[in-house]
A protein has these predicted regions:
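Generic structural motif
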Residues: 32-37, 69-71, 119
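Charge-rich, low-complexity N-terminal segments
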Residues: 1-59
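Cysteine/selenocysteine-centered motifs that mediate thiol-based redox chemistry or coordinate metal-sulfur cofactors
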Residues: 147-178
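Compact, glycine/acidic-enriched structural inserts
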Residues: 1-12, 113, 119-120, 126-149
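Low-complexity, flexible helical/coil segments
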Residues: 80-84, 124-127, 145-150, 156-160
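Well-ordered beta-strand positions
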Residues: 36-39, 63, 112-113
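The feature represents the first ordered module of a protein
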Residues: 47-97, 102
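Conserved, surface-exposed functional patches that form binding/active-site neighborhoods
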Residues: 83-134
Length: 178
């Protein structure tokens, strides 16, 4: 590992999802209560409140292991709404033998989807800096880029509509407000 890691660079963020305890341990080690977990053949649905955040009051996410994605719909507080419709993290997802504990490792790249209009890729600089700092190996970085390109291509081919693309790759997530 490089001894001169820029201050904005961090190791890959890890989250835990414990279905039996109904908790989500975030990347800072804070344990959050989960309102709902739902396991489907293609992934895990997570719904929880976001406490003590001035802009966001809740979230729904789908962990999609075969796609290497976490797709999130944020619920913004009044006056803090954003144009984005889905936030996609490129992740590695591990599931324990019981299927009751899921783990994500964030691979820095994020995609912001404005349904029917566009998708933006964020944090490419963080990915590259993490590789240079020895926090992520090149094979993992290449896999993250391939996942990002595949996701961009799928979204573009389906009019930037997540709900049209995901079923073509075996995932049919449902959302509480869509």
């Amino acid at each position: 590992m490089n001894a001169h890691i820029p201050p904005h660079i961090h190791p890959p963020k890890v989250e835990l999802f414990d279905l039996d305890a109904m908790t989500n341990t975030d990347s800072k080690g804070i344990v959050r209560e989960v309102r709902e977990y739902r396991v489907e053949p293609f992934g895990l649905y997570v719904a929880r409140d976001v406490i003590d955040h001035r802009r966001i009051h809740a979230l729904e996410s789908w962990l999609l292991p075969e796609l290497g994605l976490r797709v999130t719909d944020w619920f913004y507080r009044p006056g803090h709404e954003r144009e984005e419709h889905h936030y996609i993290d490129v992740v590695r997802i591990d599931i324990d033998a019981s299927g009751r504990c899921w783990r994500t490792q964030d691979h820095y790249l994020d995609l912001v989807v404005c349904t029917g209009r566009s998708v933006d890729v964020l944090d490419t600089d963080e990915l590259l800096d993490a590789v240079l700092a020895g926090l992520l190996d090149s094979a993992t970085a290449q896999a993250a880029l391939a996942t990002t390109y595949r996701t961009l291509d799928g979204l573009a081919r389906h009019g930037y509509r997540l709900e049209r693309w995901l079923p073509t790759v075996g995932a049919s997530p449902t959302w509480s407000r869509r």
